[in-house]
Amino acid sequence: MTRWGFGADLSIPLPVSRSVYPANDEPAQTAMAGIGQQSVRTTPLMMAMVAATVANDGEQMVPYLISQTLDADLQVVSTTKPTVARTPIDSQTAATLTGLMQQAVSSGTGTSAQVAGVSVAGKTGTAQTGSDDGGPITWFIGFAGTDINNPTIAVAVVLDGGEQIPTTGTGGSVAGPIAASVIDAAVDQ
C-alpha cells in the first residue's frame, strides 16, 4: 500500500493526517481490510487521490489547493505545475478499474451516484462500527466528467456513522447521493 502513498506525509497548506495501512498484516487481516473490517486508517483526501489515480491512467498527482495566484489587476502571478507523485498502477490496470467502477455506478451498488449527461465511475463502501449508537461508516469514491476518458473531478464522500445514519445505511444509499450532488455541481461549472 505504500506505493499508493499510505504512510507518506502530504505536503499541502492544511493539517492532514497520514493514511496508514498496517505493516506485516497476515493474509486474513488483509482480506478483512478489503471489506472495511480491520485497521486501515485513511482520509477522504487520500481516497480522492486513489480515485484520481485511476482516472489519471495510474499516475498519482501531488495534491494542491491553488492552481493560480492573481494580482490586483487579475494578472497571473504564479501557476501551480501539476506534478506526478508516484505511479502505483499501470495504465492497463487503471483502464480495467475504470470499467469496473463505471459498472458499479451504472448497474451496481453506486447507481445513486448517477448524474444525467455525466459519465461517473465509482465505488461504494460500508463498514460496521461495532456500536449500537448509530449506523455504519459509509463511503463513495469516484471520478466523473462529460467524457470518462477526460474526467474533471475526483470525489470522496464519507459519513462516519452516528445517529443520523440508519443502521441499514450503505455507501450507495447514503454517500452516493451526496457524491452525485457534488459531481453535478462541479461538472455543471
Feature locations, PLM:
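Generic non-transmembrane alpha-helical segments
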Residues: L100, I165, S181-A185
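A short acidic/glycine-rich loop-to-helix N-cap element
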Residues: L159-V174
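Beta-lactam-recognizing serine transpeptidase/beta-lactamase-like catalytic domain environment
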Residues: M1-G161
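Short, gly/Ser/Thr-rich active-site loops of penicillin-recognizing serine hydrolases
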Residues: V76-T83, S173-Q189
